A protein has these predicted regions:
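Nucleotide phosphate-binding/pyrophosphate-handling subdomain across enzymes
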Residues: 3-15, 25-35, 145, 279-383
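Short beta-strand "acidic-cap" motif of Rossmann-like dinucleotide-binding folds
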Residues: 39-43, 148, 170, 246, ...
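Beta-strand->loop->alpha-helix junctions that form or flank phosphate-binding loops
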Residues: 40, 68-69, 105-109, 241-260, ...
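Short internal beta-strands
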Residues: 38-46, 225-228, 361-362, 381-390
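Phosphate-binding loop of NTP-binding sites
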Residues: 72-76, 85-228, 232-242, 427, ...
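N-terminal leader/targeting and accessory segments in enzymes
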Residues: 1-106, 110
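C-terminal helical cap/extension that packs against the catalytic core
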Residues: 55-59, 374-432
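Residue-level signal for inorganic ion chemistry
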Residues: 32, 81, 122, 151, ...
């Protein structure tokens, strides 16, 4: 039986509720209706018209609706509930549905269940998207057909009919997706784990356990790629079911990818043999954290693609949007967009990628994560700090309380919004300076996501006269 037929067998004639109509669910709703499911859309929007252009599709598909304040009432009597990653797995309404006999799953979980090809998946607090993209491009350079999805690219489940056994699926997974997963990929990569999304998870341990899920359901033969520099990922070695390899920038390992100190060469060690991959000077990506991302990608694809494919991608790939992305140079000042930096560790990596003190725009939605680790890095790498958003006061307090603040010469400015922040940064900048949006915070106080935030910043910068 073909995978798409297996999916149809699962859902045909069943009552299926979708929580929300985000990008991935829109295509899945159409797919499920076509495969014979009785679909109900449960959404906080108050009326069908609130869905904009998609309202016409919902009407055409004759989708049932459970909208408004009591949208979770639509869970009652459902056979299957399709959870969106942003809807917490342990919310009472969802747990009640589970107890009532509903199957709670997601687009990614069903894809993992029915996918006929090898899956390579990446998780971590930082570096997921760049590492996932590097892996996909290495497979493409080797001539493989790649299906890219999860937190990046298009929804995978609606493409199930096109996936063949000789393809490869490369998937980025967040903790929100992993928390309920009971299947793992053939190759699992955990870049690092640091405090993040603590507004969503009940505590740090739940967040760590969600990340561990990428490993726990692996079936040999399989591979786990873990970051050696991170204490938490290093501790996950005990969770590995098959081959376990490291990636490390600061140490030399006998199994995995590392940066050789003697000649600054990215290498791979296996069975006592060390193979050079690429000199670090040829890497196009900015920042030492991206050396780690490239090492992780090489460890993931080792033995699956030729070394030349790794070299080609490593020496030509210039980055993903919103990740230390050059925007423009105006009056001798260079502006960068690092809107992806929604945590202190991500901002720290960005700061360390510059060889001068910069003007930093930071602040945003409060995810209840500590800012004390960011403070000394700000003092070391920032000349002017422009703060905005809900976390602005918390970042400022951490910086002012940090040893060395009084003698640092750091200037702190306060902005009401992004336009104001860019204007303040420009006013503080002199020829030769760097301005970077690297918020160390999520975007949700002012923007729906970091992409919209980054594009607004770029638009403002591009319109400076």
């Amino acid at each position: 039986m073909l995978p798409i037929q297996q999916l149809q067998e699962l859902i045909q004639g069943k009552k299926v509720a979708f929580i929300g109509a985000g990008v991935s669910h829109k295509r899945c709703i159409e797919q499920f209706v076509e495969l014979g499911a009785q679909v109900t859309l449960c959404d906080q929007k108050k009326s069908l018209d609130d869905f904009g252009d998609y309202a016409d599709t919902l009407r055409r598909l004759k989708v049932n609706l459970s909208l408004g304040e009591h949208y979770t009432d639509g869970f009652a009597g459902q056979d299957i509930i399709m959870r969106t990653p942003g809807y917490e797995y342990y919310k009472p309404a969802l747990q009640d549905a589970l107890k009532a006999g509903a199957m709670v799953t997601s687009e990614v979980e069903l894809f993992f269940e029915f996918c006929p090809c090898e899956i390579v998946a990446v998780t971590g607090s930082d570096g997921k998207t760049t590492t996932t993209t590097l892996i996909s491009k290495m497979f493409e350079a080797a001539g493989r057909r790649v299906f890219l999805g999860g937190n990046i690219g298009a929804a995978l489940l609606p493409q199930l009919a096109d996936v063949t056994p000789d393809a490869v699926a490369v998937v980025e997974l967040s903790s929100f997706q992993l928390i309920s997963m009971r299947r793992s990929p053939k190759v699992a990569v955990v870049t690092n784990v640091t405090p993040n999304h603590l507004d969503h998870h009940k505590d740090m341990q739940e967040y760590i356990d969600a990340k561990r899920n990428i490993l726990l359901w692996q079936v040999p033969p399989c591979r786990a790629v873990l970051g050696f520099e991170n204490d938490i990922t290093r501790g996950m070695e005990k969770d590995c079911k098959g081959e376990q390899v490291w990636f490390t920038r600061l140490h030399e390992t006998d199994r995995g990818a590392f940066l050789r100190e003697s000649d600054d060469m990215l290498c791979y060690a296996e069975n006592g043999v060390v193979t050079p991959i690429l000199p670090r000077k040829e890497i196009q990506l900015r920042g030492l954290h991206n050396v780690e991302n490239l090492l992780a990608a090489c460890a993931a694809v080792w033995g699956r693609v030729p070394i030349e494919a790794m070299r080609q991608v490593g020496s030509t790939f210039t980055g993903v949007e919103h990740r230390i992305e050059p925007v423009r140079t105006l009056d001798g000042v260079t502006y960068y967009n690092d809107s992806i930096a929604s945590s202190p560790t991500r901002t720290i990596a960005g700061l360390r990628s510059f060889d001068q003190k910069i003007i930093l725009i930071a602040g945003g939605y409060d995810k209840k994560i500590p800012y004390e680790p960011l403070a000394p890095e700000v003092l070391a790498h920032v000349k002017t700090l422009v703060l905005m958003g809900a976390t602005g006061p918390r970042i400022e307090k951490a910086v002012r309380d940090c040893d060395g603040f009084a003698d640092s010469g750091l200037t702190i400015l306060h902005a009401d919004n992004m336009q104001h922040a860019v204007e303040l940064a420009r006013g503080a900048a002199k020829p030769g300076d760097v301005v970077s949006l690297s918020p160390a915070s999520a975007s949700f106080d002012l923007y729906p996501n970091f992409e919209v935030r980054g594009r607004d910043y770029k638009n403002i910068v591009m319109n400076l006269k």
